[in-house]
Amino acid sequence: MTDAPVISPLDQARILSEALPHMQRYDEETIVIKYGGHAMGAEDTAKAFARDIVLLEQTAVNPVVVHGGGPQIAQMLKRLGIKSEFAAGLRITDAATIEIVEMVLAGSINKQLVGYINEAGGKAVGLCGKDGNMVSASKATRTMVDPDSRIEEVIDLGFVGEPEKVDLTLLNQLIGHELIPVLAPLATSASGQTFNVNADTFAGAVAGALRAKRLLLLTDVPGVLDQNKKLIPELSIKDARKLIADGTISGGMIPKVETCIYALEQGVEGVVILDGKVPHAVLLELFTNQGTGTLIHK
């Protein structure tokens, strides 16, 4: 491991000065940050992310964190001898699996991240979409074409949900009291059934309801890549749809970009897909001229 470069006091002051207009831009604005399970990585990475979230709050930004946990869920299921199955990029979640998913997301990852933020000097509150009926959901359905018969079939994903409504009562109270909400992507149906919700989709629904200034999707890739695998720094909704249609955007990036489009259509000003493994990625995106990742806008 190489030593970090030494920055002179003058350079440190210059960096802070250059960040001022960006800080003013986001003053009292709400930023929703989806922190993916792959982006969490090691403990030091998660703690650095937590410090950056506290810094945002200290600069009068209102951060709302939504976290994933796919790798951690997979690890726990493997330990318990429960096989993981996926369809259309979503985990098929049966009755046994939803209990593990809730335990890992709301009981382990959520509280760990809350602890890191509080340790860094923030005041975080850990919740999931079930708390206060914050996020209500309905059963998600997907279709797939059978490769042999070419017949379209409906896939039963089990207890996987799609957000239907976001009640902002609890979130607005927390934000108004300068607390940092940390949300696990679980929701409940009208009948009280718990649903596992894709974290990107959950974050998009929350950001749209809040009319957030920015939605940041921290993942394990640099952003949207072109056909030469180079980062595309900026896209309009129209551009993004063209890239989906011609196959440039494919695989797991499609639902991420569709979440971005949905959030923008709900009133979010801009959405960024960026690499959460890059140190201080959130600060680089919000407080520097260059930014990082791919910005998608109207």
Swiss-Prot record:
Record's catalysed reaction(s): N-acetyl-L-glutamate + ATP = N-acetyl-L-glutamyl 5-phosphate + ADP
Pathway stated in the Swiss-Prot or TrEMBL entry: Amino-acid biosynthesis; L-arginine biosynthesis; N(2)-acetyl-L-ornithine from L-glutamate: step 2/4
SUPFAM superfamilies reported in the protein's UniProt record: Carbamate kinase-like
UniProtKB keywords: Amino-acid biosynthesis, Arginine biosynthesis, ATP-binding, Cytoplasm, Kinase, Nucleotide-binding, Transferase
UniProt: substrate binding residues: G69, G70, R91, N196
TM annotation in the entry: none
UniProt keyword annotation of Kinase present: yes
Any single Gene Ontology cellular-component annotation: cytoplasm
Site (Transition state stabilizer): K34, K256
EC number: 2.7.2.8
Major subcellular site: cytoplasm
PANTHER family linked to this entry: N-ACETYLGLUTAMATE SYNTHASE, N-ACETYLGLUTAMATE SYNTHASE, MITOCHONDRIAL
Function in brief: Catalyzes the ATP-dependent phosphorylation of N-acetyl-L-glutamate.
Family: Belongs to the acetylglutamate kinase family. ArgB subfamily.
Name of this chain's protein: Acetylglutamate kinase
Lineage: Bacteria, Pseudomonadati, Pseudomonadota, Alphaproteobacteria, Hyphomicrobiales
